[in-house]
Amino acid sequence: MAVICFAIAAFAQDGPPSINGPILGFVADGTGATIQPIIGVLGASVVGRPLAFDSEIHNAVVSPKQNFALATRGENAEVVLIRLAVDSVTTTSLDAVAAGADLIAISPSGTAAATYTHNNKVVRFITRLAQVPETAFQFDASDIPGRLQRLAISDDGALALLNFRSGDDSTLWVVSSIGSRWVLPVQRPSAASFLMGRHDAVIADDAAQEVFVMRGIDQEASRISVASFGDGFDGIADVAASADGLRIFITTKKSETVTIVDLQATLSTALACHCVSTGLHPLKGTSVFRLSDPSNGAVAVLDASSSEPRIIVVPVMTARTVSNSKGGEQQ
């Protein structure tokens, strides 16, 4: 509790909030208009107040490494890079990236990103995020029917996954940085993400009620089934993989559980999170994911870093918590 109270006291000072003490990660709200720190460590943390910026931001997405975020700012929706360093939060305009991004995706290692604009249906691949970010490639998707629902990009910035929906139909496209594109054999894709450092992807198919890993999607791809309807999945919300690609994590739309599939041991474990899952959002640590948003109350976090995965409930800082922290009381 000492860790939490130390950090809460820092956020209780007058003026813009600063980042002090250990941070488990950051939370962007549903519209990406706010970014809140998760102060503390696993098992002893709290969701802090939103960080203050000079102007409003939108569409914010936090890097899996929790060291930066991408967002849009201003009337022209310029793309900005927000560095989330200890005691320093800086915002920089990315002049090399066209304004107007409606969707932003960051790769599993945070080395590449992609943006998409609905009105002209242009996808932009962004690389060199750790140095001077630049637009490495842009793709015109105006001849692809439907509206883009989800976007993912590989760590090397070479491939992007585009999930388009038109009525009841969905298609999952692969676009490469050399301009080629093709459709993956998925009936009704609902979620897809790349594995770290690879051109492999974990994909959810709602029509087939299946989650599978597709290896080498830019070559002669092979398909490995991970979970199917018989395993109890219905309406898949999100999928993710561990850093080594040996475990797959699945959340669904209709149940308050998260499922962990060990590909080596061919074992499946379901944990009740008692939450409305908004996805699998990486936090600091090995296989640690945020499952829900502060807008729905306390935040559920999956800690799968050990042999016995657990669900941790992280409270949200309130005015009373801040007031009590000034008085030195522990919550």
Ranges and model annotations:
Residues I23-D29, Q66-T72, G110-Y116, A158-F164, ...:
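Short beta-strand elements that form the blades of beta-propeller/WD-repeat-like
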Residues Q13-G40, V46-P64:
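Beta-strand-rich domains and repeat architectures in extracellular enzymes and scaffolds
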